[in-house]
């Protein structure tokens, strides 16, 4: 069964004596250059004249008019071709599709790509998709930064109590360390408390004069030894 546009869309039969040169208005508005036109067998009426004039009109206007995607016509084969090509490109670049789904620009991702694996840099928000307020901060990092200075002070105090030479701690005075060590020794006395008290008094006297003595431990360890 042949199919064609209804005759009501045409103002009248197309003249056959134009030599194949149809007007632009007829080729664009009334019929499509690539529209299949089937003429009934044995017909010599207006349908055969239309079939004779459609092909020369498409050739006169060039290949741009003959392409359905150039004119915006929803041709089945053209959209199918575009869909296959788009799906092939998406399978070829899966990370681009992931960035588009997250709403990030491709240029931004390329500029921030070298910073993804840096240990000293915070992880960018491009991969997780969270704002800085929503992103949780690890508690280990906060606790380490907050307790780093007290750990050093406690370690220095323990070394002084054990009689191990210490190095100056930034932000901590030597007088405070000696006072803390004396307070600790008073709170935890030992059998030879008198000897220890005399030793700490001698150390305090040297500190007041501007010299930090090298106090030997009770176990007879040399001044430069470690725990």
Swiss-Prot record:
Segments spanning the bilayer are 152-172
What GO cellular component term, any one, is given?
Answer: membrane
UniProt keyword terms in alphabetical order = Differentiation, Membrane, Spermatogenesis, Transmembrane, Transmembrane helix
The UniProt record lists the keyword Transmembrane helix: yes
Where is the stretch described as Disordered? 1-23, 204-227
Question: Where does the UniProt annotation locate this protein?
Answer: Membrane
UniProt tissue specificity:
Expressed predominantly in testis (at protein level). Expression is lower in patients with obstructive azoospermia than in fertile controls and is not detected in patients with non-obstructive azoospermia.
Membrane topology value:
Single-pass membrane protein
Highest taxon of the lineage? Eukaryota
Q: Quick one: where is this thing mainly located?
A: membrane
InterPro entries, per this entry?
SPATA25
Q: One GO BP annotation here?
A: spermatogenesis
State the protein's purpose: May play a role in spermatogenesis.
* Family recorded in the similarity comment: Belongs to the SPATA25 family.
- What protein name does the entry list? Spermatogenesis-associated protein 25
Tell me what organism the protein belongs to: Homo sapiens
**Taxonomic lineage from the root:** Eukaryota, Metazoa, Chordata, Craniata, Vertebrata
């Amino acid at each position: 069964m042949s199919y064609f546009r209804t005759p009501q869309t045409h103002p009248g039969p197309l003249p056959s004596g134009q030599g194949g040169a149809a007007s632009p208005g007829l080729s664009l508005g009334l019929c499509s250059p690539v529209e299949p036109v089937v003429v009934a067998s044995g017909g010599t009426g207006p349908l055969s004249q239309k079939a004779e004039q459609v092909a020369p009109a498409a050739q006169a206007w060039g290949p741009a008019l003959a392409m359905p995607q150039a004119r915006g016509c929803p041709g089945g084969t053209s959209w199918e071709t575009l869909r296959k090509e788009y799906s092939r490109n998406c399978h070829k670049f899966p990370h681009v599709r992931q960035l588009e789904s997250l709403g990030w620009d491709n240029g931004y991702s390329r500029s921030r790509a070298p910073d993804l694996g840096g240990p000293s840099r915070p992880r960018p928000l491009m991969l997780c998709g969270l704002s800085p307020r929503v992103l949780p901060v690890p508690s280990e990092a906060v606790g380490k930064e907050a307790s780093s200075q007290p750990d050093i002070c406690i370690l220095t105090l323990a070394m002084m109590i054990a009689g191990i030479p210490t190095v100056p701690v930034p932000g901590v005075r030597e007088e405070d360390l000696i006072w803390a060590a004396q307070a600790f020794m008073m709170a935890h006395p030992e059998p030879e408390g008198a000897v220890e008290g005399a030793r700490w008094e001698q150390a305090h006297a040297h500190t007041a004069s501007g010299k930090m003595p090298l106090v030997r431990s009770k176990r007879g360890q040399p001044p430069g030894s470690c725990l």
